[in-house]
Swiss-Prot record:
PROSITE patterns: CHIT_BIND_I_1 (PS00026), CHIT_BIND_I_2 (PS50941). The lineage of its organism: Eukaryota, Viridiplantae, Streptophyta, Embryophyta, Tracheophyta. Disulfide bonds join C23-C38, C32-C44, C37-C51, C57-C61. This is Morintide mO1. Residues 1-20 form the signal peptide. GO terms for biological process: defense response to fungus; killing of cells of another organism. Thermostable. Loses 5% of activity at 100 degrees Celsius after 1 hour incubation. Keywords: Antimicrobial, Chitin-binding, Disulfide bond, Fungicide, Signal. It comes from Moringa oleifera (Horseradish tree). One of its GO terms (molecular function) is chitin binding.
């Protein structure tokens, strides 16, 4: 029973942490904390998967293009 309680608590914390990381269009155009990049899927991170404009970065992006995307700028809506 103790293992089940621990597992339940662990999963609850994991879900709360993952939910707290949402950004961009998926989260009301919210920007990431600590100047992290917002990926095309609405998650914060610092690697090229999150920060590259070619990968669909939404804010605090690095490399390529015009504006730097700082301040929670969201990407375009497409055609």
């Amino acid at each position: 029973m103790a293992k089940l309680s621990f597992l339940s608590l662990f999963l609850l914390c994991l879900v709360a942490t993952a939910t707290a990381q949402n950004c961009g269009r998926q989260a009301g155009n919210r920007a990431c904390a600590n100047q992290l990049c917002c990926s095309q899927y609405g998650f914060c991170g610092s690697t090229s998967e999150y920060c590259s404009r070619a990968n669909g970065c939404q804010s605090n992006c690095r490399g390529g293009g015009g504006a730097d995307g700082a301040g929670g700028e969201a990407g375009g809506g497409g055609p």
